From Swiss-Prot:
It comes from Mycobacterium tuberculosis (strain ATCC 25618 / H37Rv). One of its GO terms (cellular component) is plasma membrane. Residues 63-129 are annotated as: Sigma-70 factor domain-2. This is ECF RNA polymerase sigma factor SigG. One of its GO terms (biological process) is regulation of DNA-templated transcription. Sigma factors are initiation factors that promote the attachment of RNA polymerase to specific initiation sites and are then released. Extracytoplasmic function (ECF) sigma factors are held in an inactive form by a cognate anti-sigma factor until released, although no anti-sigma factor is known for this protein. May be involved in host intracellular survival after infection (strains H37Rv and CDC 1551). A role in the SOS response is controversial; it has been seen in strain CDC 1551 but not in H37Rv. Belongs to the sigma-70 factor family. ECF subfamily.
Length: 370
Protein backbone atom coordinates (compact mmCIF):
# COMPACT_ATOMS: atom_id res chain seq x y z
CA UNK A 1 0.00 0.00 0.00
CA UNK A 2 1.46 3.33 -1.06
CA UNK A 3 1.04 6.49 0.95
CA UNK A 4 1.09 10.11 -0.11
CA UNK A 5 4.08 12.30 0.78
CA UNK A 6 4.16 13.36 4.39
CA UNK A 7 2.91 16.92 5.05
CA UNK A 8 5.26 19.52 6.39
CA UNK A 9 3.56 20.12 9.73
CA UNK A 10 3.12 17.29 12.17
CA UNK A 11 2.72 16.76 15.85
CA UNK A 12 2.97 13.75 18.14
CA UNK A 13 -0.16 12.27 19.69
CA UNK A 14 -0.43 9.28 22.03
CA UNK A 15 -2.56 6.35 20.96
CA UNK A 16 -2.82 2.74 22.02
CA UNK A 17 -1.91 -0.14 19.76
CA UNK A 18 -3.57 -3.47 20.48
CA UNK A 19 -1.87 -6.69 19.41
CA UNK A 20 -3.50 -10.09 19.65
CA UNK A 21 -6.95 -11.02 20.85
CA UNK A 22 -8.50 -10.30 24.23
CA UNK A 23 -9.94 -13.01 26.43
CA UNK A 24 -12.21 -12.65 29.43
CA UNK A 25 -10.08 -14.26 32.12
CA UNK A 26 -7.64 -11.75 33.69
CA UNK A 27 -4.85 -14.31 34.05
CA UNK A 28 -4.87 -14.74 30.28
CA UNK A 29 -5.65 -11.13 29.49
CA UNK A 30 -2.31 -9.99 30.88
CA UNK A 31 -0.29 -11.67 28.13
CA UNK A 32 -2.14 -9.62 25.54
CA UNK A 33 -2.85 -6.41 27.39
CA UNK A 34 0.70 -5.97 28.59
CA UNK A 35 1.60 -5.60 24.95
CA UNK A 36 -0.37 -2.38 24.94
CA UNK A 37 2.18 0.24 23.96
CA UNK A 38 2.22 3.96 23.56
CA UNK A 39 3.48 5.01 20.16
CA UNK A 40 4.12 8.36 18.58
CA UNK A 41 1.98 8.96 15.51
CA UNK A 42 2.60 11.83 13.15
CA UNK A 43 -0.57 13.65 12.21
CA UNK A 44 -1.39 16.89 10.50
CA UNK A 45 -2.16 19.87 12.67
CA UNK A 46 -5.15 20.70 10.52
CA UNK A 47 -8.18 18.63 9.73
CA UNK A 48 -8.33 16.56 12.94
CA UNK A 49 -11.72 15.79 14.43
CA UNK A 50 -12.47 16.74 18.06
CA UNK A 51 -12.90 13.05 18.95
CA UNK A 52 -9.39 12.33 17.70
CA UNK A 53 -8.08 15.21 19.78
CA UNK A 54 -9.67 13.73 22.89
CA UNK A 55 -8.32 10.28 22.14
CA UNK A 56 -4.89 11.76 21.83
CA UNK A 57 -5.24 13.12 25.37
CA UNK A 58 -6.59 9.84 26.76
CA UNK A 59 -3.40 8.69 28.44
CA UNK A 60 -2.73 12.05 30.09
CA UNK A 61 -6.30 12.29 31.36
CA UNK A 62 -6.60 8.74 32.71
CA UNK A 63 -3.13 8.08 34.11
CA UNK A 64 -3.79 10.00 37.40
CA UNK A 65 -6.57 7.51 38.19
CA UNK A 66 -4.56 4.33 37.64
CA UNK A 67 -3.64 3.90 41.32
CA UNK A 68 -7.18 4.17 42.61
CA UNK A 69 -8.49 1.93 39.83
CA UNK A 70 -5.93 -0.65 40.95
CA UNK A 71 -7.13 -0.32 44.55
CA UNK A 72 -10.77 -0.68 43.44
CA UNK A 73 -10.11 -3.76 41.31
CA UNK A 74 -8.04 -5.23 44.14
CA UNK A 75 -10.85 -4.76 46.64
CA UNK A 76 -13.23 -6.43 44.19
CA UNK A 77 -11.00 -9.44 43.48
CA UNK A 78 -8.59 -9.82 46.39
CA UNK A 79 -5.80 -10.39 43.88
CA UNK A 80 -3.00 -8.00 42.93
CA UNK A 81 -2.24 -9.96 39.77
CA UNK A 82 -5.88 -9.95 38.63
CA UNK A 83 -6.32 -6.30 39.62
CA UNK A 84 -3.43 -5.22 37.41
CA UNK A 85 -4.90 -7.10 34.45
CA UNK A 86 -8.38 -5.70 35.10
CA UNK A 87 -7.06 -2.13 35.22
CA UNK A 88 -5.48 -2.72 31.82
CA UNK A 89 -8.74 -4.10 30.47
CA UNK A 90 -10.66 -1.19 32.01
CA UNK A 91 -8.42 1.32 30.26
CA UNK A 92 -8.71 -0.60 27.01
CA UNK A 93 -12.51 -0.50 27.20
CA UNK A 94 -12.41 3.16 28.19
CA UNK A 95 -10.13 4.03 25.28
CA UNK A 96 -12.47 2.34 22.83
CA UNK A 97 -15.45 4.23 24.29
CA UNK A 98 -13.68 7.54 24.88
CA UNK A 99 -15.01 9.11 21.71
CA UNK A 100 -18.55 8.71 23.04
CA UNK A 101 -17.82 9.96 26.56
CA UNK A 102 -20.18 12.92 26.90
CA UNK A 103 -18.94 14.19 30.24
CA UNK A 104 -22.29 13.71 32.00
CA UNK A 105 -20.31 12.35 34.94
CA UNK A 106 -16.72 12.99 35.96
CA UNK A 107 -14.00 11.00 34.21
CA UNK A 108 -13.19 9.38 37.55
CA UNK A 109 -16.78 8.17 37.99
CA UNK A 110 -16.93 6.93 34.40
CA UNK A 111 -13.70 4.94 34.80
CA UNK A 112 -14.87 3.36 38.06
CA UNK A 113 -18.12 2.39 36.39
CA UNK A 114 -16.21 0.58 33.66
CA UNK A 115 -13.83 -0.99 36.18
CA UNK A 116 -16.70 -2.27 38.34
CA UNK A 117 -18.44 -3.98 35.44
CA UNK A 118 -15.14 -5.36 34.17
CA UNK A 119 -14.56 -6.92 37.59
CA UNK A 120 -18.10 -8.29 37.80
CA UNK A 121 -17.66 -10.03 34.46
CA UNK A 122 -14.30 -11.48 35.50
CA UNK A 123 -15.69 -12.74 38.83
CA UNK A 124 -18.54 -14.73 37.30
CA UNK A 125 -18.31 -18.32 38.53
CA UNK A 126 -15.21 -17.71 40.64
CA UNK A 127 -14.68 -18.81 44.21
CA UNK A 128 -13.75 -16.33 46.91
CA UNK A 129 -10.08 -15.82 47.75
CA UNK A 130 -9.58 -16.87 51.39
CA UNK A 131 -6.89 -16.62 54.00
CA UNK A 132 -6.22 -19.70 56.16
CA UNK A 133 -8.10 -18.07 59.06
CA UNK A 134 -11.22 -18.16 56.88
CA UNK A 135 -11.10 -21.94 56.50
CA UNK A 136 -11.51 -23.22 60.05
CA UNK A 137 -10.12 -23.32 63.56
CA UNK A 138 -6.44 -22.76 64.46
CA UNK A 139 -4.01 -25.64 64.18
CA UNK A 140 -3.22 -27.37 67.45
CA UNK A 141 0.35 -28.48 66.79
CA UNK A 142 2.85 -25.98 65.34
CA UNK A 143 5.40 -28.81 65.15
CA UNK A 144 3.14 -31.00 63.01
CA UNK A 145 3.15 -31.49 59.26
CA UNK A 146 2.23 -28.41 57.24
CA UNK A 147 -0.49 -28.89 54.63
CA UNK A 148 0.11 -26.94 51.44
CA UNK A 149 -2.63 -26.17 48.89
CA UNK A 150 -1.25 -24.25 45.95
CA UNK A 151 -4.34 -25.00 43.87
CA UNK A 152 -6.33 -22.58 46.06
CA UNK A 153 -6.56 -19.01 44.80
CA UNK A 154 -5.46 -17.27 48.00
CA UNK A 155 -5.92 -13.64 48.92
CA UNK A 156 -2.92 -11.53 47.91
CA UNK A 157 -1.34 -8.41 49.44
CA UNK A 158 -1.30 -4.98 47.80
CA UNK A 159 1.66 -2.57 47.56
CA UNK A 160 1.07 0.85 49.08
CA UNK A 161 -1.08 2.98 46.77
CA UNK A 162 -1.20 6.08 48.95
CA UNK A 163 2.38 7.30 48.74
CA UNK A 164 1.82 9.76 45.88
CA UNK A 165 0.60 13.16 47.09
CA UNK A 166 -0.47 13.95 43.54
CA UNK A 167 -2.98 11.08 43.59
CA UNK A 168 -6.41 12.71 43.03
CA UNK A 169 -8.16 10.14 45.20
CA UNK A 170 -8.35 10.82 48.91
CA UNK A 171 -11.24 8.44 49.58
CA UNK A 172 -10.13 5.41 47.58
CA UNK A 173 -6.57 5.86 48.76
CA UNK A 174 -7.63 5.54 52.37
CA UNK A 175 -5.53 2.79 53.90
CA UNK A 176 -8.43 1.39 55.91
CA UNK A 177 -10.23 0.50 52.68
CA UNK A 178 -7.39 -1.75 51.49
CA UNK A 179 -6.56 -3.23 54.88
CA UNK A 180 -5.94 -6.95 54.52
CA UNK A 181 -8.60 -7.94 57.07
CA UNK A 182 -11.19 -5.73 55.34
CA UNK A 183 -10.41 -7.15 51.89
CA UNK A 184 -10.60 -10.67 53.34
CA UNK A 185 -14.00 -9.82 54.81
CA UNK A 186 -15.20 -8.54 51.42
CA UNK A 187 -14.53 -11.99 49.99
CA UNK A 188 -17.46 -13.32 52.03
CA UNK A 189 -19.84 -11.18 49.94
CA UNK A 190 -21.18 -11.98 46.50
CA UNK A 191 -19.51 -9.96 43.72
CA UNK A 192 -22.58 -7.72 43.30
CA UNK A 193 -22.85 -7.14 47.05
CA UNK A 194 -19.15 -6.31 47.04
CA UNK A 195 -19.58 -3.85 44.18
CA UNK A 196 -22.54 -2.09 45.79
CA UNK A 197 -20.83 -1.82 49.17
CA UNK A 198 -17.62 -0.42 47.69
CA UNK A 199 -19.38 2.08 45.45
CA UNK A 200 -21.64 3.29 48.26
CA UNK A 201 -19.42 3.13 51.34
CA UNK A 202 -15.91 3.61 49.92
CA UNK A 203 -16.50 5.77 46.85
CA UNK A 204 -19.52 7.47 48.43
CA UNK A 205 -21.78 7.15 45.39
CA UNK A 206 -25.53 7.66 45.67
CA UNK A 207 -27.79 4.63 45.33
CA UNK A 208 -29.16 5.90 42.02
CA UNK A 209 -25.62 6.23 40.63
CA UNK A 210 -24.79 2.69 41.70
CA UNK A 211 -28.00 1.35 40.18
CA UNK A 212 -27.23 3.04 36.88
CA UNK A 213 -23.65 1.75 36.92
CA UNK A 214 -24.47 -1.93 37.42
CA UNK A 215 -27.78 -1.98 35.56
CA UNK A 216 -30.32 -2.49 38.33
CA UNK A 217 -32.88 -0.55 40.36
CA UNK A 218 -32.31 1.70 43.34
CA UNK A 219 -34.47 -0.64 45.43
CA UNK A 220 -32.24 -3.57 44.47
CA UNK A 221 -29.11 -1.56 45.32
CA UNK A 222 -30.43 -0.68 48.77
CA UNK A 223 -31.35 -4.31 49.39
CA UNK A 224 -27.90 -5.53 48.30
CA UNK A 225 -26.26 -2.88 50.47
CA UNK A 226 -28.28 -3.83 53.54
CA UNK A 227 -27.40 -7.51 53.17
CA UNK A 228 -23.74 -6.71 52.49
CA UNK A 229 -23.40 -4.50 55.55
CA UNK A 230 -25.14 -7.06 57.74
CA UNK A 231 -22.93 -9.91 56.57
CA UNK A 232 -19.78 -7.84 56.77
CA UNK A 233 -20.40 -7.04 60.42
CA UNK A 234 -19.88 -10.71 61.27
CA UNK A 235 -16.47 -11.03 59.61
CA UNK A 236 -14.83 -7.61 59.35
CA UNK A 237 -12.45 -6.07 61.95
CA UNK A 238 -14.27 -4.36 64.82
CA UNK A 239 -14.61 -0.58 64.81
CA UNK A 240 -12.36 -0.46 67.88
CA UNK A 241 -9.62 -2.32 66.02
CA UNK A 242 -8.40 0.73 64.14
CA UNK A 243 -5.39 0.59 61.87
CA UNK A 244 -2.43 2.64 63.06
CA UNK A 245 -0.44 4.58 60.48
CA UNK A 246 2.33 2.29 59.19
CA UNK A 247 4.77 5.19 59.02
CA UNK A 248 4.12 6.39 62.58
CA UNK A 249 7.16 6.37 64.91
CA UNK A 250 5.53 3.68 67.09
CA UNK A 251 4.80 1.37 64.16
CA UNK A 252 8.23 1.89 62.65
CA UNK A 253 9.93 1.18 65.98
CA UNK A 254 8.01 -2.07 66.48
CA UNK A 255 8.68 -3.14 62.89
CA UNK A 256 12.40 -2.43 63.36
CA UNK A 257 12.46 -4.61 66.49
CA UNK A 258 10.53 -7.34 64.66
CA UNK A 259 13.07 -7.30 61.81
CA UNK A 260 16.02 -7.25 64.20
CA UNK A 261 14.71 -10.27 66.12
CA UNK A 262 14.33 -12.33 62.95
CA UNK A 263 17.71 -11.34 61.56
CA UNK A 264 19.37 -12.21 64.87
CA UNK A 265 17.34 -15.44 65.09
CA UNK A 266 16.42 -14.35 68.60
CA UNK A 267 13.45 -16.55 69.56
CA UNK A 268 13.16 -15.11 73.08
CA UNK A 269 12.91 -11.59 71.71
CA UNK A 270 10.28 -12.70 69.17
CA UNK A 271 8.06 -14.07 71.95
CA UNK A 272 8.05 -10.65 73.60
CA UNK A 273 6.93 -8.91 70.40
CA UNK A 274 3.63 -10.80 69.98
CA UNK A 275 0.41 -10.29 71.89
CA UNK A 276 -0.86 -13.22 73.95
CA UNK A 277 -3.56 -14.00 71.35
CA UNK A 278 -1.52 -13.15 68.25
CA UNK A 279 -2.31 -14.97 65.00
CA UNK A 280 0.13 -16.28 62.39
CA UNK A 281 -0.94 -17.62 58.99
CA UNK A 282 1.02 -18.28 55.82
CA UNK A 283 -0.79 -19.15 52.59
CA UNK A 284 -0.56 -21.49 50.68
CA UNK A 285 -0.39 -23.52 53.93
CA UNK A 286 -3.87 -24.10 55.31
CA UNK A 287 -2.99 -24.07 59.00
CA UNK A 288 -2.94 -21.01 61.20
CA UNK A 289 -1.65 -20.56 64.71
CA UNK A 290 -2.72 -18.53 67.72
CA UNK A 291 -0.68 -17.43 70.70
CA UNK A 292 2.85 -16.09 70.97
CA UNK A 293 4.33 -19.40 72.11
CA UNK A 294 2.68 -21.37 69.29
CA UNK A 295 4.00 -18.86 66.76
CA UNK A 296 7.60 -18.95 67.91
CA UNK A 297 7.46 -22.76 68.15
CA UNK A 298 6.29 -22.80 64.53
CA UNK A 299 9.14 -20.51 63.49
CA UNK A 300 11.72 -22.51 65.44
CA UNK A 301 10.50 -25.91 64.18
CA UNK A 302 9.38 -25.17 60.62
CA UNK A 303 11.42 -22.22 59.37
CA UNK A 304 14.52 -23.19 57.30
CA UNK A 305 16.70 -20.75 59.26
CA UNK A 306 19.07 -21.99 61.92
CA UNK A 307 21.33 -19.15 62.99
CA UNK A 308 21.77 -15.36 62.98
CA UNK A 309 22.19 -13.97 59.49
CA UNK A 310 20.16 -16.70 57.76
CA UNK A 311 17.27 -14.25 57.34
CA UNK A 312 17.35 -10.69 56.07
CA UNK A 313 14.31 -8.42 55.92
CA UNK A 314 13.36 -5.19 54.16
CA UNK A 315 10.70 -2.94 55.70
CA UNK A 316 7.83 -1.76 53.49
CA UNK A 317 4.11 -1.00 53.48
CA UNK A 318 1.43 -3.38 52.21
CA UNK A 319 -2.33 -2.90 52.40
CA UNK A 320 -1.73 0.30 54.33
CA UNK A 321 -0.01 -1.75 57.06
CA UNK A 322 3.56 -2.26 58.28
CA UNK A 323 5.16 -5.07 56.31
CA UNK A 324 8.48 -6.75 55.67
CA UNK A 325 9.98 -8.78 52.86
CA UNK A 326 11.98 -11.75 54.14
CA UNK A 327 14.95 -13.19 52.27
CA UNK A 328 16.43 -16.59 53.21
CA UNK A 329 20.07 -17.55 52.92
CA UNK A 330 20.88 -19.69 49.87
CA UNK A 331 24.63 -20.16 49.69
CA UNK A 332 26.31 -16.79 49.37
CA UNK A 333 23.11 -14.82 48.77
CA UNK A 334 19.67 -14.36 50.28
CA UNK A 335 16.67 -15.13 48.05
CA UNK A 336 12.98 -14.10 48.35
CA UNK A 337 11.11 -16.24 50.86
CA UNK A 338 8.09 -14.57 52.49
CA UNK A 339 6.21 -11.28 52.51
CA UNK A 340 4.92 -10.42 56.02
CA UNK A 341 1.92 -8.10 56.52
CA UNK A 342 1.47 -7.08 60.16
CA UNK A 343 -1.35 -5.92 62.39
CA UNK A 344 -0.22 -4.11 65.52
CA UNK A 345 -1.98 -3.55 68.83
CA UNK A 346 -0.34 -0.93 71.03
CA UNK A 347 3.33 -1.95 71.16
CA UNK A 348 2.87 -5.59 70.09
CA UNK A 349 2.26 -7.56 66.89
CA UNK A 350 -1.25 -9.02 66.89
CA UNK A 351 -1.46 -10.69 63.48
CA UNK A 352 0.97 -11.71 60.73
CA UNK A 353 0.07 -12.99 57.28
CA UNK A 354 3.26 -14.41 55.75
CA UNK A 355 2.79 -14.85 52.00
CA UNK A 356 5.09 -17.44 50.44
CA UNK A 357 4.30 -16.39 46.85
CA UNK A 358 7.66 -15.02 45.72
CA UNK A 359 6.16 -13.75 42.44
CA UNK A 360 4.85 -10.89 44.59
CA UNK A 361 8.34 -9.52 45.24
CA UNK A 362 8.74 -7.74 41.86
CA UNK A 363 5.26 -6.22 42.32
CA UNK A 364 6.59 -4.48 45.43
CA UNK A 365 9.72 -3.27 43.64
CA UNK A 366 11.90 -5.62 45.68
CA UNK A 367 15.30 -6.93 44.54
CA UNK A 368 15.82 -10.48 43.24
CA UNK A 369 18.40 -11.18 45.93
CA UNK A 370 20.35 -9.60 48.78
Amino acid sequence: MRTSPMPAKFRSVRVVVITGSVTAAPVRVSETLRRLIDVSVLAENSGREPADERRGDFSAHTEPYRRELLAHCYRMTGSLHDAEDLVQETLLRAWKAYEGFAGKSSLRTWLHRIATNTCLTALEGRRRRPLPTGLGRPSADPSGELVERREVSWLEPLPDVTDDPADPSTIVGNRESVRLAFVAALQHLSPRQRAVLLLRDVLQWKSAEVADAIGTSTVAVNSLLQRARSQLQTVRPSAADRLSAPDSPEAQDLLARYIAAFEAYDIDRLVELFTAEAIWEMPPYTGWYQGAQAIVTLIHQQCPAYSPGDMRLISLIANGQPAAAMYMRAGDVHLPFQLHVLDMAADRVSHVVAFLDTTLFPKFGLPDSL
